[in-house]
Amino acid sequence: LSYTYRHSDRLFNGQSGVANPNNISTTFHRISLNGQFRFSDELTLSAFVPWLEGGRKERGTTDRRLSGLGDVTLLAQWSPWAGDAEAQPLLSGLSLLGGIELPTGEDNDQPFTGNAAPSLFQLGNGTFNPKLGFSYGKAIDKSSYFGRVVATIPIGESDADLDSGSYLQASVGTGYRLTDALTLQLSVDGTFRERDQLNNVDVSNTGSVSLSVTPAVSWRVNDKLAVDASASIPFFHDVRSTQVAPGTSFQLGARFNF
């Protein structure tokens, strides 16, 4: 179970911040119920069910709201060498990822294309979105190292003729176990988005590159419960046209083992 908060109020054009005289901003709250089942050392299946609350403001007045179920994601992780770590010490940390994002979130009949992040302000994009990628993790004594790359490739168009752009998410980081219960992590994360299309025409204020640094802490309360906290702090934006760039996001989570 996790909760994420993000407030965004900085306008960018390309890599430069620009004036925001109308005080355009967006605020998002997301509660996500996540489940994971391990069939074996090699195969794990995960599900992510998000609930979203959001609003867009201009000149101090909320002109757009979101509330409801977002797009549910199913993801399989296959680690072919996980059960043979002694014979394959380097490959044992490699996992292949594959899954799909389901169109469970409501998509708008007339998607909003104003200066907002995301540019098309809706709970879901109305298409099936396959996901492919890989991850790698390695622990050495009290230190750990990890990386992850996942591409999302929407198929087809929504009922409103919205063709969402593909995007790539990448992360690389390290962790250090201070005690048996307390671990600190630091990662650099990137999101690379192609432009969306509406009625077969590029939406000008879509498509971007965002980089952020994410410090995180994990506390294992006992064998059944762990608590996590993190903050994702953007340090680089490169957007097409003028957009509200994503602001800092804060996340709190709890993990239960059954």
Question: PLM features: what roles do these ranges have?
Answer:
Residues 1, 45-47, 74, 92-98, ...:
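Transmembrane beta-strands of outer-membrane beta-barrel proteins
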Residues 6-12, 54-58, 83, 101-107, ...:
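Sequence/structural signature of outer-membrane beta-barrel proteins
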Residues 23-75, 79:
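Long, hydrophobic/aromatic-enriched structural stretches that serve as scaffold segments
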Residues 27-31, 66-72, 92, 126-130, ...:
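Residues that define the transmembrane beta-barrel architecture of outer-membrane proteins
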Residues 42, 81-93, 142, 181, ...:
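Short loop/turn motifs that connect adjacent beta-strands in outer-membrane beta-barrel proteins
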Residues 10-21, 161-258:
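Outer membrane beta-barrel transmembrane domains
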Residues 5-30, 113:
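Surface-exposed strand-loop-strand hairpins of Gram-negative outer-membrane beta-barrel proteins
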Residues 3, 37, 49, 78-80, ...:
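Residue-level signature of outer-membrane beta-barrel architecture
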